[in-house]
Amino acid sequence: MKKWLGFSLTPPLRICNSEEEELRHDGSDVWRYDINFDHHHHDEDVPKVEDLLSNSHQTEYPINHNQTNVNCTTVVNRLNPPGYLLHDQTVVTPHYPNLDPNLSNDYGGFERVGSVSVFKSWLEQGTPAFPLSSHYVTEEAGTSNNISHFSNEETGYNTNGSMLSLALSHGACSDLINESNVSARVEEPVKVDEKRKRLVVKPQVKESVPRKSVDSYGQRTSQYRGVTRHRWTGRYEAHLWDNSCKKEGQTRRGRQVYLGGYDEEEKAARAYDLAALKYWGPTTHLNFPLSNYEKEIEELNNMNRQEFVAMLRRNSSGFSRGASVYRGVTRHHQHGRWQARIGRVAGNKDLYLGTFSTQEEAAEAYDIAAIKFRGLNAVTNFDINRYDVKRICSSSTIVDSDQAKHSPTSSGAGH
């Protein structure tokens, strides 16, 4: 309550001497409201603050010995005309001597609920909305007493003689004005700066479309089973995982079987399908329908796994690091002749077999060396029945192609 009013409701008692007379700026006497109280009139009724603040009780109280009557409500309304706001006005509080010993010194009536409600109703009915002003001084003509504004700078209290208005302090009024401004601002529509709006773009859901060979450039994966793309050359390679064998030291059973490199993704996928049919039969998963491989199924039935894989490699577009379709044959990059090599025979290194004018001569040289080191299980470019296997295996050196081919073969050449 005290914070809302901006002043204390329990002011100290103050009795002014009757000898104190103040002069206005024009030299006239100033009538003081809080003087000329008789300390011996204990039987007289003492006015209460509730009666001063109530609009319904317009009781006139004697002020001095001259029986000067001042109507409190009239003075309040007179001194607070509409259109003025007392900013710098000090709070006016009437000071009465404690004439009744039964009354408390702290004017506890303001602290009761009824007094607070009366004061609020007085504020709502008797105090209009005031515009801002710095000073307010009023003089009432035609009355027996001169009323003027007088402020006591020493005590900080307004000692205006007949001014009984309890004006709101500057802080309380500013709080009320601020509250009204806040309510007005809430009712205003909120304006949004269009320039600072963020454009929230919802991500469009992309439909899953099967990848094409052009879209998968630079990626190692493919839309086909068993096909990968070389990260450097961009060519497609086909691989098959053979889980029928396990070497020592391997954590995963089986080995990867290389089926050759291809320029087109579909060719690599077909090579995988043919190898899968040879290893696991027609019930395996394929990239294309089984009806597309009717002719190839007849051929693969006449060969074992190694021979069929060798045939797939020879038919690939980039076999054995060169342009030749034969196993172990490469083309020299300077003079363009064909070279034959075989690997993993001499200390796990490649063995150079010579340079030849044609791919077929180089391929025959590779077949003879493969039979020499691997026997009848060797994977050759041509049919192994063309060669004299016993003579090749019994020789301490690698024989030439003429000696290897013309030698008669009795038996044991069927794989």
Curated annotation (Swiss-Prot):
Q: Which GO terms describe its molecular function?
A: DNA-binding transcription factor activity; transcription cis-regulatory region binding
Q: Which Pfam families match?
A: AP2 (PF00847)
Q: At the top level of its lineage, which domain of life is listed?
A: Eukaryota
Tissue specificity statement from the Swiss-Prot or TrEMBL entry: Expressed in roots, seedlings, inflorescence, and siliques. Also detected at low levels in leaves.
Q: Which CDD domains match?
A: AP2 (cd00018)
Q: One GO term of the cellular component aspect? A: nucleus
**Which controlled-vocabulary keywords does the entry list?**
Activator, DNA-binding, Ethylene signaling pathway, Nucleus, Repeat, Transcription, Transcription regulation
Which GO biological process annotations does it have?
ethylene-activated signaling pathway
Q: What is its main location?
A: nucleus
Q: Which residues form a coiled coil?
A: none
Give me the positions annotated for DNA binding.
223-289, 325-383
Q: Do you know which Gene3D superfamilies this protein is assigned to?
A: AP2/ERF domain (3.30.730.10)
| Localization of this protein | Nucleus
Question: What SUPFAM superfamilies does this protein's entry cite?
Answer: DNA-binding domain
Listed PROSITE patterns = AP2_ERF
Homology family = Belongs to the AP2/ERF transcription factor family. AP2 subfamily.
Q: What does this protein do?
A: Probably acts as a transcriptional activator. Binds to the GCC-box pathogenesis-related promoter element. May be involved in the regulation of gene expression by stress factors and by components of stress signal transduction pathways.
Q: How does it assemble?
A: Interacts with ANL2, HDG2 and HDG10, and possibly with GL2, HDG3, ATML1 and PDF2.
What is the protein's given name? Answer: AP2-like ethylene-responsive transcription factor AIL1
Natural source organism? Arabidopsis thaliana (Mouse-ear cress)
